[in-house]
């Protein structure tokens, strides 16, 4: 699968419109981590105003987490994006979401 097909598959899997997906990719691209989506948008249970839950398996260094949240808030993305700090997640939570993770970047 080429890069364009991969992007289309991810875009469809997380149930957001094309413009929001491009904004999300651009914001996440500023950070050296792999990001995964999980939750209602991945499970096909999203409603019109559902947020997008994002998780990084890697611990985010320094102020990267807060800067990422600010970058998302300052962007033109039309949905709320909830970024989870992996260092604050319990092992039970990680186990609960691991089957649903869809790599975004």
Cite the ranges covered by each PLM segment.
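Short, well-ordered beta-strand segments
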Residues: 53-55
């Amino acid at each position: 699968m080429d890069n364009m097909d991969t992007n289309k598959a991810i875009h469809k899997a997380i149930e957001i419109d094309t413009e929001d997906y491009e904004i999300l990719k651009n914001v996440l691209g500023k950070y050296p981590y792999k990001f995964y989506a999980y939750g209602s948008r991945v499970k096909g249970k999203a409603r019109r105003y559902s947020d997008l839950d994002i998780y990084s398996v890697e611990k985010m260094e320094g102020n990267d987490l807060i800067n990422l949240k600010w970058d998302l808030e300052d962007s033109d993305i039309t949905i709320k994006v909830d970024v989870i700090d992996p260092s604050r997640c319990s092992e039970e939570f990680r186990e609960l979401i691991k089957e649903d993770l869809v790599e975004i970047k």
